[in-house]
Amino acid sequence: MKFNKVEMIAIMSMANAMITADGKVEDEETSVISHEIMKFGVPIEDFKEIYLRGIKMEPSYATEIVSKMTSEQKKYVAAFLGTIMAVDGDIDEKEMALWRLLSQICGLPTMSVKDAVFYMAAND
């Protein structure tokens, strides 16, 4: 899977929204995000920039970018967000609502949390 820098920043924006949706940020959630960004070969010095720009990106711009991605990229984003939501073992209603909303706005494929986790594990 390939993403350009702006796409990664948009994904980071959504990932940040997901980890803060329930009002608490767990170490497991931040670890999943770090692992995925590094998996794409992003140098450690660029990770900080992507992270900070993702936090600052307007949600409407992030959803616009993600909505223009290919079907496979969208499947990855849906699975990534679902995995972030599930990794701490506690799926909060606010996280689930955000996942559904982002999926609807961006045209992400519908999948269960189980399918999201399996997809990410299979593509690790």
Feature map (PLM): residue ranges:
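Small-residue-enriched hydrophobic alpha-helices in membranes
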Residues: 1-124
